[in-house]
């Protein structure tokens, strides 16, 4: 048994062609949908980045009792449980929080790992002298500016390196048995720094200041800048789609669909101006943030090109992978093995929790959701009830739920 887990960061469900979006170019996600079961009601659990990864490892909600932090010594970590049971686990990622204080110790649960440097403000390349930031809207920082100088050009982008290492692993190990390859690119997380090849596909007449790193705040920028920033996300998303396509090509050529599970998922979404907000964390956890894409191919069931309405979450991935490899699921895991859902659309839960420690707490049944939002100024809690539809997609005429 073999499995590939591909986890993107900030992958917007409502910006993917198979989920009904028409303004982005994501043909390989559409191709993936034909190769797998696509879930219509997948929700995040704990936001943002590292809380979501603790859920990926433990199959348990994190935000109810703890904020951002490392894997704990007492945690049942899915990759470590596989490792102890004789399944080789390998992580390839450019997600810099894995080697930061406060977010570390996740990667050490694998048999081996490879870390690609240079994303966001990763303290990677040294530059002792002054660093001049260009005129910009939104965010920018000096370390990121230094890093950008080293990741321009063919083959230098961290995303390219991550997938290059994934192909290296597959070339070396595709004929072996009992392994999990966890591929985790940081993209399309901000900053939206994509090569011109992809930017040109979303080209416009924007002539303003650089704007590829939105603030975690209300939208206040001119409309032209807002459109430009969304196009920058689209360009990076299309680059992610292209490298997903290379992985699908590899699986086609080497007939890996016969005996290799493929899971493609994300941790959460990202607001691109919907509801008057950029980014995440501060605003209400709208559908664009909490309602996530999920694709699973399971060679045991052989089901492909179908959709599922069952309500599923991030916490279901750990028990699903453990079950796939025949490893017992610890009783403290709150997630569900999704094999039965892949076979036929059987519900596994009536409601799903999601939120962030010390902030919003939300529950959904896949049709409605209730969110308890903290009003820090009034030291009170605001209860909101909303329909589970992405009503304010910025390109509403081209997107549907």
Residue ranges and their predicted role:
Residues 1-5, 103-114, 142, 152-208, ...:
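Active-site regions of oxyanion-processing enzymes, predominantly non-cytosolic
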Residues 1-37, 46, 83:
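Active-site-proximal N-terminal segment of extracellular/periplasmic enzymes that hydrolyze or transfer
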Residues 22-25, 44, 69-76, 227-239, ...:
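A short beta-strand-to-alpha-helix junction
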Residues 24, 191-197, 201-204, 250-306, ...:
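Histidine-centered active-site microenvironments of extracellular/periplasmic hydrolases
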Residues 26, 56, 159, 163, ...:
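Polar, surface-exposed loop/tail segments
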Residues 55-152:
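Catalytic-site neighborhoods of secreted/periplasmic enzymes
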Residues 157-174, 213-262, 324:
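A long, amphipathic alpha-helix that forms part
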Residues 287, 357-401:
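C-terminal, low-complexity/hydrophilic appendages and adjacent surface loops
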């Amino acid at each position: 048994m073999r499995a590939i887990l591909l986890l993107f960061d900030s992958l917007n469900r409502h910006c993917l062609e198979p989920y009904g979006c028409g303004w982005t170019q994501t043909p390989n996600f559409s191709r993936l949908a034909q190769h797998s079961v696509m879930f219509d009601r997948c929700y995040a659990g704990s936001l943002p980045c590292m809380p979501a990864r603790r859920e990926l490892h433990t199959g348990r909600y994190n935000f109810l009792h703890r904020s951002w932090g490392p894997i704990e010594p007492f945690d049942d970590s899915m990759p470590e449980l596989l490792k102890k049971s004789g399944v080789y686990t390998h992580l390839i990622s450019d997600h810099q929080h894995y080697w930061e204080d406060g977010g570390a110790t996740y990667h050490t649960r694998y048999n081996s790992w490879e870390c690609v440097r240079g994303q966001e403000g990763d303290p990677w390349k040294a530059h002792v002298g002054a660093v001049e930031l260009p005129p910009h809207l939104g965010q920018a920082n000096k370390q990121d500016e230094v890093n950008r100088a080293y990741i321009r050009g063919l083959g230098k982008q961290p995303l390219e390196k991550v997938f290059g290492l994934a192909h290296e692993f597959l070339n070396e190990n595709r004929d072996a048995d009992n392994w999990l390859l966890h591929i985790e690119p940081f993209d399309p997380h901000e900053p939206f720094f994509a090569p011109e090849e992809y930017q040109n596909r979303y080209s416009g007449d924007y002539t303003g200041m650089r704007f590829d790193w939105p603030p975690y705040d209300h939208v206040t920028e001119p409309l032209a800048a807002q459109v430009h920033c969304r196009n920058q996300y689209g360009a990076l998303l299309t680059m992610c789609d292209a490298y997903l396509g290379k992985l699908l090509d590899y699986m086609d050529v080497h007939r890996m669909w016969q005996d290799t599970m493929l899971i493609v998922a994300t941790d959460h979404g990202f607001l691109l101006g919907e509801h008057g907000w950029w980014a995440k964390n501060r605003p209400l956890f709208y559908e664009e943030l909490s309602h996530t894409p999920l694709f699973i191919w399971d060679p045991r069931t052989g089901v492909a090109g179908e959709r599922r309405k069952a309500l599923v979450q991030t916490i279901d991935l750990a028990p699903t992978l453990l079950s796939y490899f025949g490893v017992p699921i610890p009783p403290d895991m709150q997630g569900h093995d999704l094999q039965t859902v892949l076979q036929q659309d059987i519900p596994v839960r009536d409601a799903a929790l999601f939120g962030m420690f010390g902030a919003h707490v939300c529950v959904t049944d896949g049709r409605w959701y209730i969110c308890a939002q903290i009003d820090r100024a009034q030291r009170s809690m605001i209860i909101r009830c909303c329909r589970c539809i992405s009503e304010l997609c910025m390109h509403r005429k081209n997107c549907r739920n």
